[in-house]
Amino acid sequence: MNIYSIIKKPHVTEKTSLGTEAANTITLVVDRDSNKIEIKKAVESLFKVNVTSVRTVNVAGKVKRFGRNYGKRQNWKKAYITLKEGQTVDFFEV
């Protein structure tokens, strides 16, 4: 798999921003078919950092209503990536 198809986007919420500061962890939305080894290699090669651990969560899509019809949002995978001490990734760097 291509590293750009494995890593889709950063997942930025209030909870993940607290984890970034406290535990040196970044959170990414990744491809559902990717595994921890592929995610680790993609992050290390793309951001030039050392990855200590990768934890993944499969998130089920919510059922939403569109007028009278019901639909379902897509399932997705989230990865919590712990970086080596002293290393950071700044997603909003200009």
Swiss-Prot record:
Transmembrane segments: none annotated. GO terms for molecular function: rRNA binding; structural constituent of ribosome. Pfam families: Ribosomal_L23. GO terms for cellular component: ribonucleoprotein complex; ribosome. SUPFAM superfamilies: Ribosomal proteins S24e, L23 and L15e (SSF54189). One of its GO terms (biological process) is translation. Gene3D superfamilies: 3.30.70.330. Keywords: Ribonucleoprotein, Ribosomal protein, RNA-binding, rRNA-binding. It comes from the Bacteria. One of the early assembly proteins it binds 23S rRNA. One of the proteins that surrounds the polypeptide exit tunnel on the outside of the ribosome. Forms the main docking site for trigger factor binding to the ribosome. Belongs to the universal ribosomal protein uL23 family. Part of the 50S ribosomal subunit. Contacts protein L29, and trigger factor when it is bound to the ribosome. This is Large ribosomal subunit protein uL23. The gene is rplW.
